[in-house]
């Protein structure tokens, strides 16, 4: 059995990563070869937000101290972790999709050299509009996030780009195609 592939989805907050991953999860629900990893975050669960596991700071510290995270990082005052279960899934031949961090990508590549980064891109105007609509940031924070998104340089290594300015199903089908192609090529070489 060949090892699965790790897909590390990145993009600015408001680019639609959560919606895109939810679309992919629903479309590939019957495919045992593709697994979407949940993040562990020190943030309460929101009704229309990311499907994550909410942890307190103490819970996060305890999991970190016992080595339960394969990947972990801090961003915007929150802490994020990806459980070590992804290693089992990869070893079993599953392709694993996770919501990552642009800043943490070099460390993720060091730990998982074969990972494929998927950059979800949107125009600055669409990004600002989406951030305003979700209502979590002030205008100053929105301006800083848009500026940061413009400054992001494409990283070294394998990178797929998905434009997510249009209807969700367009970008969603692109993600499904990337994951399905990887699954098909893995089966061809098994």
From Swiss-Prot:
GO biological process, one term: 5-phosphoribose 1-diphosphate biosynthetic process
Disulfide bonds: none
Entry EC number(s): 2.7.4.23
A Gene Ontology cellular-component term: cytosol
One GO MF term attached to the UniProt entry: ribose 1,5-bisphosphate phosphokinase activity
Coiled coil: none
Pathway field: Metabolic intermediate biosynthesis; 5-phospho-alpha-D-ribose 1-diphosphate biosynthesis; 5-phospho-alpha-D-ribose 1-diphosphate from D-ribose 5-phosphate (route II): step 3/3
Residues reported to bind ATP: 11-18
Keyword hit for Cytoplasm: no
InterPro entries referenced in this protein's UniProt entry, alphabetically: GK/Ca_channel_bsu, Guanylate_kin-like_dom, P-loop_NTPase, PhnN
Keywords for this protein: ATP-binding, Nucleotide-binding, Transferase
Catalysis performed (reactions): alpha-D-ribose 1,5-bisphosphate + ATP = 5-phospho-alpha-D-ribose 1-diphosphate + ADP
Metal-binding in keyword set: no
UniProt cross-references to HAMAP family, sorted A to Z: PhnN (MF_00836)
UniProt family annotation: Belongs to the ribose 1,5-bisphosphokinase family.
UniProt xrefs under NCBIfam families: phosphon_PhnN (TIGR02322), PRK10078.1 (NF007485)
General function of this protein: Catalyzes the phosphorylation of ribose 1,5-bisphosphate to 5-phospho-D-ribosyl alpha-1-diphosphate (PRPP).
Protein name in the entry: Ribose 1,5-bisphosphate phosphokinase PhnN
Record organism: Thiobacillus denitrificans (strain ATCC 25259 / T1)
Encoding gene, per UniProt annotation: phnN
């Amino acid at each position: 059995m060949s090892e699965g592939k790790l897909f590390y989805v990145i993009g600015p907050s408001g680019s639609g990563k959560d919606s895109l991953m939810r679309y992919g999860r629903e479309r590939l629900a019957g495919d045992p070869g593709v697994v979407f990893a949940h993040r562990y975050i020190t943030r309460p669960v929101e009704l229309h937000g990311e499907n994550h596991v909410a942890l307190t700071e103490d819970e996060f510290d305890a999991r970190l101290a016992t080595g339960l995270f394969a990947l972990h990082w801090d961003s915007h005052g929150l802490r994020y972790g990806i459980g070590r279960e992804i290693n089992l899934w990869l070893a079993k031949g599953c392709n694993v999709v996770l919501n990552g961090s642009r800043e943490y990508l070099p460390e993720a590549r060091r730990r998982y050299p074969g990972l494929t980064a998927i950059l979800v891109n949107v125009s600055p105007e669409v990004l600002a509009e989406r951030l305003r609509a979700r209502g979590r940031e002030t205008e100053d924070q929105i301006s800083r996030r848009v500026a940061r998104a413009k400054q992001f340089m494409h990283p070294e290594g394998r990178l797929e780009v998905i434009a997510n300015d249009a209807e969700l199903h367009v970008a969603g089908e692109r993600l499904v195609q990337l994951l399905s192609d990887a699954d098909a090529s893995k089966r061809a070489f098994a």
